[in-house]
Amino acid sequence: MTHTRRIHILDPRLANQIAAGEVVERPASVVKELVENAIDAGSQRIEIDLESGGARLIRVRDDGRGIDQEDLPLALSRHATSKIASLDDLEGVDSLGFRGEALASISSVSRLELISNTHDEPSDGWRVVAEGRQMEPRVTPAPHPRGSSVVVRDLFFNTPARRKFLRTEKTEFGHVEEAFRRLALSRYDIGWILRHNQKVVHQLRAGDASTSMERRVGALLGRKFLENALHVDIEATGLRLWGWVGLPTHSRAQADQQYFFVNGRVVRDRLVAHAVRQAYRDVMFHGRHPVFVLYLELDPHVVDVNVHPTKHEVRFRDGRLVHDFLFSSLHRALADVRPNATSTEGGDEATPSTDATTATAAEASAGQAEPRWQQQGMALAAGQERERPAAHRVREFMAGYRALHPEHEASLLTPQPQEAAEEAAGTPAPPASSSPAMAETDDTQAPPLGYAVAQLHGVYILSQTERGLVVVDMHAAHERITYERMKQQVHGDGQALGRLQTQPLLVPVSIAASAREVETAENERATFERLGVELDVAGPETLLVRQVPVLLGNADVEALIHDMLGDLERFGRSDRLEVHINELLSSMACHGSVRANRRLTVPEMNALLRDMERTERSGQCNHGRPTWTEMSMHELDKLFLRGQ
């Protein structure tokens, strides 16, 4: 005989331990919660001490506002907080913590001691102690400077099952250090100290000046990150994105150097990850992950941070706006990375340049006279634009290279790829025009990639610059140039497939779809039309594809439509069609670019260098491999022990 179990209220001690299972996973979780409380208290200096990776001891000390004596017992109670008092406060919360669960959860699985003082006199401090399931905290006087100290000993001492899941001391400290890194990157105006087993691991000074910020980023992520990163600062539509994004050539095998903050809170969000992945799509080597430290600032009322137990996920009121802002900002910044004539301090290395960082930098450069080599290139490009419409740029580019050395026309550039692109776009072929190579000028400012001096094994171009030697992979560089010209012809300036020739299907493709997919297809009809796809609703669970772009060829239309609908539902946009078309253009550009063992004349090599300087994303080929590298005179001198 079975008995029905009656519903009852959980014992407070059991409820706290259940909550601890969500909040307290390992020592790093404790550090995160305690430090966030210290930040919310207005601290200017935070010290963290650990023993045995945090399993034996965690101490967090701050110089914040402190907690009143009367509030100390409440601080260890569930759902007790000073940070919000109403639903309106929750909807616009700007503090890191607000649920009032952290200290109660931590104290239920450890021996916790909290000492705090709200006055400047050290003798005015008070201590409250809680141990495991002991729910009657004891408050006693204790000297302490203004601020608070939280000491957590013997984590999971009363839950052996949880304690045995802890890893080695080194592993647990690694997780704590990563949590510290994220917290220290969130607030540059706070000084930080991290000690492990009484040894200082990190000591960071407070400072919100740009140099202080870069110094902290370099200390936490390494100088190599800063040397291979772009600083961005972009503001639009009530959103501001600033921080550092790594160059495509500075990537990692794991996504372990990706830090994204929303209003000072570190988050891991699918929408953000998708936007960043899209921005790097054309320039990142397959299987690699970008590195970045980015900060998004927006009105707290348009973002919900109360959607995850550890607050790692957020929900934006207008996810499509945020996604498009992130994508367009990063896409533009990465597209503008090109060889720059200025060098880093010491003159040893060339630095990438982008006009997407700040408006003041762009305005400052606008008033400066362009060097002669750049004026000539711009004049040539402008003249070609007046003579021919933009739809002919692919053929114009390829014809220009053939005109440089007509006796090698067949081996330099085969016409098939460009003709395929023109056929897809529905444009006639213009007559060929020459693009004369840039001759060496008398200007004191040489072009960033210098002037070609030789070709090595028919593969690499050797160029002399003001700083030293540049080596260019001519096939990879030409592949990127050709690819960008093809994309420009097909997509145009707005990345919309408006010029793309479409074809009606002789037999419409019937697609079985869910009710949600049908609803998305109806709502996004204009989006599909803009992409050259005619998609009709034929029934409550059926879609019909009547027209697709010509370039899709024999693609799996049904799978593509399902993927696009999924993206539109989750992220508010889909780039599946563009990706598929760009893959075809990339393959065409690869086969249509100058091959290894093709001997180029010096004018041809210089023409290629000038085109690299004018082409977006020319630092990487279509597959994400670097197209050029540089060795400074200092590096060359070191090889031969000159000046030793």
Swiss-Prot record:
Annotated stretches, region: Disordered: 338-390, 416-445
GO terms under cellular component: mismatch repair complex
Gene Ontology annotations of biological process type: mismatch repair
Read off the SUPFAM superfamilies from this record.
ATPase domain of HSP90 chaperone/DNA topoisomerase II/histidine kinase, DNA mismatch repair protein MutL, Ribosomal protein S5 domain 2-like
Work out whether the entry's keyword set contains DNA repair. Answer: yes
Q: Where are the transmembrane segments?
A: none
The record's SMART domains line, in alphabetical order, gives: DNA_mis_repair (SM01340), MutL_C (SM00853)
Enumerate the UniProt keywords alphabetically. DNA damage, DNA repair
Bias (Low complexity): 349-366, 416-427
Identify the CDD domains for this entry. Answer: HATPase_MutL-MLH-PMS-like, MutL_Trans_MutL
PANTHER family listed in its UniProt record: DNA MISMATCH REPAIR PROTEIN MLH, PMS, MUTL, DNA MISMATCH REPAIR PROTEIN MLH1
What family classification does the UniProt entry report for this protein? Answer: Belongs to the DNA mismatch repair MutL/HexB family.
**In UniProt terms, what function does this protein have?**
This protein is involved in the repair of mismatches in DNA. It is required for dam-dependent methyl-directed DNA mismatch repair. May act as a 'molecular matchmaker', a protein that promotes the formation of a stable complex between two or more DNA-binding proteins in an ATP-dependent manner without itself being part of a final effector complex.
Q: What is this protein called?
A: DNA mismatch repair protein MutL
What species does this protein belong to? Chromohalobacter salexigens (strain ATCC BAA-138 / DSM 3043 / CIP 106854 / NCIMB 13768 / 1H11)
